[in-house]
Curated annotation (Swiss-Prot):
A single cellular component GO annotation: viral outer capsid
Function as written in the Swiss-Prot or TrEMBL entry: VP5 protein is one of the two proteins (with VP2) which constitute the virus particle outer capsid. Acts as a membrane permeabilization protein that mediates release of viral particles from endosomal compartments into the cytoplasm. Permeabilization activity is probably negatively regulated by VP2 and is triggered by endosomal degradation of VP2 and exposure to low pH.
Stored InterPro entries: Capsid_VP5_Orbivir (IPR000145)
Region annotation (Involved in membrane permeabilization) ranges: 1-42
Name of the protein: Outer capsid protein VP5
Ribosomal protein is among the record's keywords: no
Encoding gene per record: Segment-6
Pfam families listed in its UniProt record: Orbi_VP5 (PF00901)
Chain coiled-coil ranges: none
Keywords for this protein: Capsid protein, Outer capsid protein, Viral penetration into host cytoplasm, Viral penetration via permeabilization of host membrane, Virion, Virus entry into host cell
Homology family: Belongs to the orbivirus VP5 family.
Localization per Swiss-Prot or TrEMBL: Virion
GO biological process: symbiont entry into host cell via permeabilization of host membrane
Length: 526
């Protein structure tokens, strides 16, 4: 269990003390009169910005130029119309989630219509039975249907899809790591198809990057969702590599309504089984090698990162199948005996026993302090049920404070075995506010509001799904806490833009681009 409390870094934060510092005096005695006048005039007028601010800031404070302004790119590739929402705006997040759900349903239905026969041949007819049951339930209740059998078939079918996806990704990673001369013809074709997709993605990203303003946080956008879907899927389970409708694992699950049937029959919410993305790692690799060819080993690392997320979902499903369903069946039989009901239906009382509170779902949960809510907010990030892990990430942007802490797991109906380690969310939140209150940088009014906020529970503002593995999510959070350079890039602009940048860096990661500047040459020509 770890805990980190740090002060956030911003551009210009130390400029106020720069002229009187010992480091500044040393700099003044060495850089010459012209540069000295340049520094004083620019700082005095508060006109330092962009590269000028970054370069001069590094000189007058003695810090490395690595902390100066570069181009920061949030590592998500977006379809048209999608934006990172403000974490403190539930309405904004809700509309975006509903639009995405409608788009996914339309795309998944196209996959079912196009590949239905091939999918049934590969994954057997159980998928079709589950889908027919879903449609039957939508039209009229089929009371004599053996609902627990349908539930079992839905879980089994989902397990087959995840197993196949796991296998295909491991195959691709293995083939990418092989020497070119050692690959068979089939392996060479597979690697070439994947490289073609990466090249398409690379070209699109390069076009967007060329159009981006320097020294700005940006999301790389511009490709349609369908093309992105094809380009980001390493090995489609069924269908051509760059087809318009690709039969990915997520598309097959969505087309045959597996998660919806499992939720309708058992009350177990599997919406956290999102589309495990490798796009952040792929985009990071493409940006790193933008001027040269990407080596196969670097691509293999991206595939293995996605593999980690697939295995996380697979372990979760096996936890549901092996641990939860037997308990569910036992509770169902007990309820039928009490009710003296011989029908093959699952009683709603049984479902309610396996419902868990929304605030304990495996998602990123957003809270804010009751007062000064725009500046004081935090994320409670929860892992899959089988892992029973979570962490706290709190921000006070008015005094530039960040607090990270690993927390104890929640005890609920579908969690794994409990371990007595870590503190609760309430304890972490109160310590976070106590530390913010004790800081001397805040105004008197801000301190009063924090004291008032400490006496009540924080405001719950909803939750978001994350599309990467929990370990990668934790890695992104820790990078926000530790990486001063990253902090300086995401903490710029209007306050709502800073919150979006923080959420983007948490969900997707952030890569800082740009080459180091020749500082002596810069000052010589200033």
């Amino acid at each position: 269990m770890g805990k980190v409390i740090r002060s956030l870094n911003r551009f210009g934060k130390k400029v106020g003390n720069a002229l009187t510092s010992n480091t500044a005096k040393k700099i003044y005695s060495t850089i010459g009169k012209a540069a000295d006048e340049f520094l004083e005039s620019e700082i005095g007028s508060a006109a330092i910005d962009g590269l000028v601010q970054g370069s001069v800031h590094s000189i007058i404070t003695g810090e490395s130029y690595g902390e100066s302004v570069k181009q920061a790119v949030l590592l998500n590739v977006l379809g048209s119309g999608e934006e990172i929402p403000d974490p403190l705006s539930p309405g904004e997040r809700g509309i975006q989630a509903k639009l995405k759900e409608l788009e996914d349903e339309q795309r998944n239905e196209l996959v079912r219509l196009k590949y239905n026969d091939k999918i049934k041949e590969k994954f057997e007819k159980e998928l079709e039975e589950v889908y027919n049951f879903y449609n039957g339930e939508a039209n009229a209740e089929i009371e004599d249907e053996k609902q627990f059998d349908i539930l079992n078939k839905a879980v089994t079918s989902y397990n087959k899809i995840l197993t196949e996806e796991d296998l295909q990704n491991r195959r691709l990673a293995t083939r990418l790591q092989k020497e070119i001369g050692e690959r068979t013809h089939a392996e060479t074709v597979m690697v070439k198809e994947y490289r073609d997709k990466i090249d398409a993605l690379k070209n699109a990203i390069e076009v967007e990057r060329d159009g981006m303003q320097e020294e700005a946080i940006q999301e790389i956008a511009g490709m349609t969702a369908d093309v992105l879907e094809a380009a980001s899927e390493e090995v489609p389970l069924i269908g051509a590599g760059m087809a318009t409708a690709v039969a990915t694992g997520r598309a097959i699950e969505g087309a045959y309504k597996l998660k919806k049937v499992i939720n309708a029959l058992s009350g177990i919410d599997l919406t956290h089984f999102t589309h495990y993305e490798n796009r952040p790692s792929v985009v990071s690799t493409i940006l790193e090698y933008r001027a040269k060819e990407i080596p196969d080993n670097a691509l293999a690392v991206s595939v293995l990162i996605k593999e980690r997320a697939i295995q996380e979902n697979h372990k979760e499903l096996m936890h549901i199948k092996n641990e939860i369903l037997p308990r569910f069946k036992k509770a169902m039989d007990e309820e039928k005996e009490i009710m003296r009901d011989r029908r093959q239906m699952i009683h709603p009382k049984v479902m309610m026993k396996f419902k868990i509170p929304r605030a304990q779902q495996p998602q990123i949960h957003v809270y804010s302090a009751p007062w000064d809510s725009d500046d004081v907010f935090f994320f409670h990030c929860i892992s899959h049920h089988h892992a029973n892990d979570s962490f706290f990430l709190g921000f006070d942007l008015s005094i530039d404070l960040v607090h990270y802490e690993d927390l104890t797991a929640h005890a609920h109906a579908i969690g794994a075995a409990q371990t007595a380690a870590g503190r609760t969310l309430t304890e972490a939140y109160r310590e976070f506010l106590n530390l913010a209150i004790s800081k001397a940088f805040g105004t008197q009014m801000h301190t009063r509001r924090l004291v008032r906020s400490k006496t009540v529970h924080p405001i719950y503002l909803g939750s978001l799904h994350y599309d990467i593995s929990f370990s990668d999510l934790r890695g992104n959070a820790q990078r926000i806490v530790y990486d001063d350079e990253l902090q300086m890039h995401i903490l710029r602009g209007p306050i709502h833009f800073q919150r979006r940048a923080i959420l983007g860096a948490l969900k997707f990661g952030c890569k800082v681009l740009g080459d180091r500047l020749d500082v002596p040459l810069f000052l010589r020509n200033a």
